[in-house]
Amino acid sequence: MRLVVCLVFLASFALVCQGEAYRGGYTGPIPRPPPIGRPPLRPVCNACYRLSVSDARNCCIKFGSCCHLVKG
């Protein structure tokens, strides 16, 4: 009996939360920020030949890789 009461409570709570989400204008997951302006990740720094000078500079400062492109 307690299990049934618990399941009914959880189902009603989920319906209320779903209704609040739509009423508040929230329709989906929060989008990720664009990659522009984000620091390059370590795997990007491993492929030095594909980097721009600014990305190579960031890789050199943060991770110590691709520094030969900056000194170039």
UniProtKB/Swiss-Prot annotation:
One GO cellular component term: cytoplasm
Keyword NAD applies: no
Disulfide bond entries: C45-C59, C48-C66, C60-C67
Localization annotation: Cytoplasmic granule
Modified residues (Lysine amide): K71
One Gene Ontology term from the biological process aspect of the record: defense response to bacterium
Pfam families reported for this sequence: Penaeidin
Signal peptide range: 1-21
GO molecular function annotations of the record: chitin binding
InterPro entries for this protein: Penaeidin
Keyword set, alphabetical order: Amidation, Antibiotic, Antimicrobial, Chitin-binding, Disulfide bond, Fungicide, Signal
TM stretches of this protein: none
Major localization class: cytoplasm
Record-stated family: Belongs to the penaeidin family.
Main function: Antibacterial and antifungal activity. Presents chitin-binding activity.
Name by which UniProt lists this protein: Penaeidin-2b
